[in-house]
From Swiss-Prot:
Belongs to the insulin family. GO terms for cellular component: extracellular region. GO terms for biological process: glucose metabolic process. Residues 1-24 form the signal peptide. Disulfide bonds join C29-C107, C41-C110, C53-C123, C109-C114. This is Con-Ins Q1. It comes from Conus quercinus (Oak cone). The modification Serine amide is found at S130. Pfam families: Insulin. Expressed by the venom gland. InterPro entries: Insulin-like, Insulin-like_sf, Insulin-rel_pep, Insulin_CS. Heterodimer of A and B chains; disulfide-linked. It is found in: Secreted. Its main location: secreted.
Amino acid sequence: MTTSSYFLLVALGLLLYLCQSSFGTEHTCEPGASPHPQGKCRPELAEFHETMCEVEESLQGGTDDARKKRGRASLLRKRRGFLSMLKARAKRNEASPLPRAGRGIVCECCKNSCTYEEITEYCPPVTEGSG
């Protein structure tokens, strides 16, 4: 192997290492990890998630008119649906003998402090009729 080939191989390896270390910043959680001081947990997480999804929906072309007409009852139904979904998912995960990946909305936003982009990953897709 020539010196230039060796140098190119080392440079490529270093570049791959830098890309992996800078882009691999996903949150992970250990079992029993304590909540982050700026993390949002339980009802606060549900409220934050709902608010951020509504912001994301309005940014993607949804309107606030239908939401104002539906009123607070619709928000409570959405929250109850979200919480029941989380409860069902938790029960499935408890019954599963396989280890969990350690990444989810609770890991990213309660055990860690999540960004706007991270929490909106968990929002339902915006459709034309959802505005």
